[in-house]
Amino acid sequence: AYSRDNLGEDALWQFQDTKNINNEVLRSIFINKLNSIYQKDINYHFECLTEINDLPNIDLFDLIRIIGIAYDNALEECVNLRHSGINTVEINSMLYQDAPNKLEFEIKNTCRNQLITNKLHQEGITNKANHEGLGLATVKKIANKYRNVYIAYSSDNGYFTFTISIE
């Protein structure tokens, strides 16, 4: 099969849980982002043990943008750590649905210890050169359009954790 020949058995195994995401557009963003991590040879784990059927009340494009930004930020941080000589980097993510119209996504990645999280969501505040990293400000702007979307993130013991809960 095309996927097996081009991705390898270990990559296909890592994508296995995406089969539980029953929305093709949502599933494709996870496959795309996980493949990007795989291509950069970064350790990762994705878990989606529950069937994702009824999406919560959020525009699908907004949900995909938030998930995409979270993965892009994690991947960029891990690549930057690699360039600075830190080879032990990883990205772990999880998608979970315990009831219809509820959804939780969490991504946790290796990060610099001095990452300051209390200002990252402010527009124009970034840890990146040339102020390229406005992703979390964009995430906050999107989340603020909804009363049922909760965003949380923290940096602890060399890991950055980003969570979105939608009820």
Residue ranges and their predicted role:
Residues T18-I21, Y44-I66:
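Conserved short strand/loop->alpha-helix "switch" segment adjacent to the catalytic nucleotide/phosphoryl-transfer site
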Residues T18-K40:
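Short beta-to-alpha transition helix within the HATPase_c
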Residues F46-T50, Q97, C111:
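Heptad-repeat coiled-coil segments of the DHp/HisKA dimerization-phosphoacceptor module
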Residues L60-S84, K145:
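Conserved ATP-binding N-box helix of the HATPase_c
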Residues S84-P100:
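Short beta-strand/loop element within the Bergerat-fold HATPase_c
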Residues P100-G133:
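Glycine-rich/acidic phosphate-handling loop/turn and adjacent ATP-lid/helix
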Residues T138-Y150:
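Conserved glycine-/histidine-rich ATP-lid loop and adjacent helix of the Bergerat-fold HATPase_c
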Residues G158-E167:
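Short C-terminal beta-strand
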